[in-house]
Amino acid sequence: MTRPSARHVLPEFTERTSAGTRTSDPYSKLLQERIVFLGTPVDETSANDVTAQLMYLEHQAPDRDIELYVNSPGGSFTAMTAIYDTMRYVACDVATTCLGQAGPSAAVLLAAGTPGKRAALPGARVVLHQPALTEPVRGQAGDLAVHAAELVRVRARLEEILVRHTGRTPGQVAADLERDTVLDARQAREYGLVDRIVPGRRTPPASSGAR
């Protein structure tokens, strides 16, 4: 597994075990606690890392929850669908929590958590917008038509996923994707992207019925 990039040196912990000593980093410690952290843009590398961890944790204990923490600006729709499909494939419930931000692709993963187990910290920010091509398309008319058709397919798939997990109507989701829709934690809860706002581990969470 490739470590997420960091601007600082990650600390390492040395623990004494029955077999001797073991050195690990924060991400390894989180994995031991069944926590997967998505803290980078959603791309092929991060998708492979997250899906591998989800499948490993399912194999380790298929009857225990997995916690997916999200702080990501979003990214590739294709990479996002790899994580999304794996979340739905594994037998474990996947609880999702947004801390910081969940950009468009990451917002889908946040919403795709097990119903009742989707949360946001008070300062979280969630963004929705329609998919776009990552770079200009060049070529003959037939090539442009292929890319246009794929963009329409991706847009339809994104709308379908958001409708499924938020309870919004197709018309509402389609309208909200026409422009950048920026939501704070309370608005994300009202939209149906999360179920509750969690101020802290010792503080009772604010559920969807709270104002």
UniProtKB/Swiss-Prot annotation:
One GO term (biological process): protein quality control for misfolded or incompletely synthesized proteins
The GO terms this record gives for MF are: ATP-dependent peptidase activity; ATPase binding; serine-type endopeptidase activity
Extent of the signal sequence? none
Superkingdom as given in the UniProt entry:
Bacteria
**Biological role:** Has lost one of the conserved residue (Ser) proposed to be part of the active site. Therefore it could be inactive.
Cross-referenced NCBIfam families: PRK12553.1
The protein's name in its UniProt record: Putative ATP-dependent Clp protease proteolytic subunit-like
What organism does this protein naturally occur in? Streptomyces coelicolor (strain ATCC BAA-471 / A3(2) / M145)
Identify the taxonomic lineage of the organism of origin. Bacteria, Bacillati, Actinomycetota, Actinomycetes, Kitasatosporales
Q: Which gene encodes it?
A: clpP5
